Amino acid sequence: MKRICIYVTLSLLISTSQAQTFQRTENGIKTTVADPNVNVEIQWFTPGSLRVLKTPQGQTVEKKSLSVIAQPAKTDLRVTSSGDGLITMKSQSLTVTLDTKNGTLTYAKPDGSILLKELKNDRPFTKTNDAGRQTYIVYQGFQTDKEEGLYGLGQLQNGKMMQRNMTKVLAQGNVEDVSPIFQSTKGYGVYWDNYSATTYTDNNQETSFSSVVGDCIDYYFMYGQSADGVIAAV
């Protein structure tokens, strides 16, 4: 009898240690990731749009967007966690999975078709000094398909409609009106909510944003199923 009790107790301890803890909020989830050491918060706005906030562990950032006026809204979600470190959020339009082993997010259609993946981020926050204020260079990379078209970034003077295989510093100038947003022919868009000089990179390894000043990684993912749908979400 003692052996049975010991076995059951050990089984419960193992299953508890394997389950990823997270806080369910009114509009999404909050959790922490050990590698890299970041806090992750996901705020849903609609069944197809959400905000991702990442901050260094041990720091609290209350950031109010200067460009997004919409507020997170209660969304019908099914949230589950698994023993292999995955937290999955499902709405009627979108499935979002956070891998807590490496901090990456994957966005998929309800049928499981992948829309976009984050790349493992080994340098989310690099300490820097901005006019005497300690802050960070913030970076996030994504894995996009080679055959998908990416459009956006504002009104550029590069003679291109498709923004692929390029590196571009997004900073306002006299002849260009830039915006750190791209949309895909897969029917989704990504808006990088940072107002400092930001480098957009697209090559065979990644599609990424890197901003010279930021207290957090802050971006919006919008799945509208089409270009018009993404524009409507924006």
Residue ranges and their predicted role:
Residues 34-35, 45, 82, 184:
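A short, compositionally biased micro-patch
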Residues 81-234:
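Catalytic and substrate-binding clefts that recognize carbohydrates or anionic sugar/phosphate headgroups
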Residues 34-35, 55-57, 110-111, 185:
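Short, flexible beta-strand-to-coil junctions
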Residues 1-23:
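Bacterial Sec-dependent N-terminal signal peptides
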Residues 20-34:
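Short N-terminal segments immediately surrounding and downstream of signal-peptide cleavage
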Residues 22, 26, 43-87, 125-127:
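A low-complexity, Ser/Thr/Gly/Pro-enriched, surface-exposed linker/loop concept
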Residues 39-48, 62-71, 97-111, 120:
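Extended Gly/Ser/Thr-rich low-complexity repeat segments
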Residues 28-31, 38-41, 178-179, 208:
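Short secondary-structure capping/turn segments at boundaries of alpha-helices and beta-strands
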